[in-house]
From Swiss-Prot:
Known role: Endonuclease that specifically degrades the RNA of RNA-DNA hybrids.
Listed name of the protein: Ribonuclease HII
Superkingdom of source: Archaea
Keyword Cell inner membrane in annotation: no
GO BP field: DNA replication, removal of RNA primer; mismatch repair
InterPro entries: RNase_H2_suA (IPR004649), RNase_HII/HIII (IPR001352), RNase_HII/HIII_dom (IPR024567), RNase_HII_arc (IPR020787), RNaseH-like_sf (IPR012337), RNaseH_sf (IPR036397)
Cofactor(s), by name: Mn(2+); Mg(2+)
UniProt record similarity statement: Belongs to the RNase HII family.
Reactions this protein catalyses: Endonucleolytic cleavage to 5'-phosphomonoester
Organism: Pyrobaculum arsenaticum (strain DSM 13514 / JCM 11321 / PZ6)
Alphabetical UniProt keywords: Cytoplasm, Endonuclease, Hydrolase, Manganese, Metal-binding, Nuclease
GO molecular function: manganese ion binding; RNA binding; RNA-DNA hybrid ribonuclease activity
Enzyme class per UniProt: hydrolase
Residues in the signal sequence: none
Length: 198
């Protein structure tokens, strides 16, 4: 009997603007490798979109979760961002059952995140740094990035151009200082945001 394998990854952990998106893909390693899945950061936006369509067509299960800034703020203020990611990863695992899951770990101690997720779900979990070497994780990274990019584009139409959304981006900092800031799209708990208003 063939082992079913799932991969989980996220997009948007670092920006001060917009949501965090986690995604899961359950599918055949060889088939995913053949279509060219790899770390979403190494692909152009167009290549990601093309692969996203192919992943949806061929995977056994694909799903994602959107974590809004207010929920991120709530958990960051208590030092529990990794716990928040674990909670959403567990929900995705319920939606896409598999025999084994590979997860790109947000924790500096990859095994700690994997052990926690395994304990929470009762499933077999292997947590890795650079997890995109596993085709299912690479596919999940593409799904998460495409979904987040689309949400960010919608946000830009609503609130104006805020640059990359990263605190190192001058355009993002100027937009934050500009005052027309809907609370719900900014991660106020980020230290760099607090410094701007001191």
């Amino acid at each position: 009997m063939t082992l079913s394998v799932g991969g989980i990854d996220e997009a948007g952990r670092g920006p001060v603007v917009g949501p965090l998106v986690l995604a899961i893909v359950v599918g055949d390693s060889e088939a995913l490798s053949k279509i060219g899945v790899r770390d979403s950061k190494s692909l152009s936006p167009r290549a990601r979109e093309v692969l996203y369509g192919k992943i949806l067509e061929m995977a056994v299960c694909v799903n994602y979760a959107v974590v809004e800034p207010y929920e991120i703020d709530l958990h960051v203020s208590r030092g529990m961002l990794n716990a928040l990611e674990m909670k959403y990863a567990a929900k995705l695992m319920e939606l896409c059952p598999a025999d084994l899951y590979y997860v790109d770990s947000p924790d500096v101690k990859a095994a700690r995140f994997g052990d926690g997720l395994s304990f929470l779900t009762g499933r077999r979990v292997v947590s890795l740094h650079k997890g995109e070497a596993v085709p299912q994780v690479a596919a999940a990274s593409i799904v998460a990035k495409v979904v987040r990019d689309r949400l960010v584009e919608m946000l830009r139409k609503e609130v104006g151009d805020f640059g990359s959304g990263y605190p190192s981006d001058r355009k993002t900092r100027e937009w934050l200082r500009g005052g027309r800031i809907p609370h719900e799209c900014v991660r106020w708990s980020w230290e760099t945001v607090g410094k701007l208003f001191k």
